[in-house]
Amino acid sequence: SLIQDISGSGAGWRGPALIIGAIGILLGMYLFPTLKHHRSIVNFIFVFPLLFTFVVTVIIPLCLGVFYSFTDWNGIKMTGFVGFANYKAMFNEPSFLWSLIITILFVVLNMVLVNVVAFMLALLCTSKVKGLSFFRASYFLPNLIGGIVLGYVWQFVFNNVLIKMTNNISLLSKTNTAMMAIIVVYIWQYAGYIMLIYVTGLTQVPKDVLEASQIDGANAVTTLFKIKIPMIAATITICTFLTLTSAFKQFDVNMALTNGTGSVASFFGNYLTNGTQMLALNIYNTAISKNNYALGQAKAILFFIILAAVSIIQVRISNKKEVEM
């Protein structure tokens, strides 16, 4: 029945297909009558749709992407293999190297700034200030706005509102200030989400431990650095890696706010016009705007390797901290 739907064939075979499937399940239960086998069959039935979707939407495209990165694929067909030519061209492309460098800088800065801002907001939202629910909702709200919409809204703010405070010079007109603007927008968008995770971690700190520290004469600063922060070390690790992976994948705000434009006078002797173009946007422009799908796919594979390495490190560190706790 699923094959009929995918192929677009008529629905006349849907009923017989479902009946055959049901008969197959009953036959399997008859051939394997034990409860253990029945549970295995039922588990497979429920897991199969998710597993099938994962294979079709993730595994197969990934394998095809690796394959196409070694060819001269133009999005429709390929004429032959080119080996590592796309990877060599990638690392010989000044605009790509620039995008890789500013993406790493963007990730490092945001990994620190977002977590600091989010942690401070979390401390505020776990204090005894009135209206905490309002503050939590207000800080989290920007995360619910789509990145494209957010980028165009802030583009209007920078070009039409804040321009009056900067001598009629938009912050988006220069590469350095435009990157600062992207960082500000990213912090404004993502800090509220990270804040909620920190709030969860802070609220799980045992109250009797905090009360004991107060009895022992510990002030707020000592309690923060000696008790709260060590006890939410696992939460800090999670938030750090969430911010890291999210910053690496920055695309929509970058596209809507600056579209990667910005001049760089000299980068290894080259004049660049993609001063604010980060890695994800560079991959998109290579494949879509320049119609160089094979080179774009090679860049995407490198991008995947970076994110996979970050994820593996995160899992290892998280597991290590859980064992220590």
Regions found by a protein language model. Give the residues of each.
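Transmembrane alpha-helices
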Residues: 1-38
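A structural signal for multi-pass alpha-helical bundles of membrane permease subunits
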Residues: 2-10, 39-325
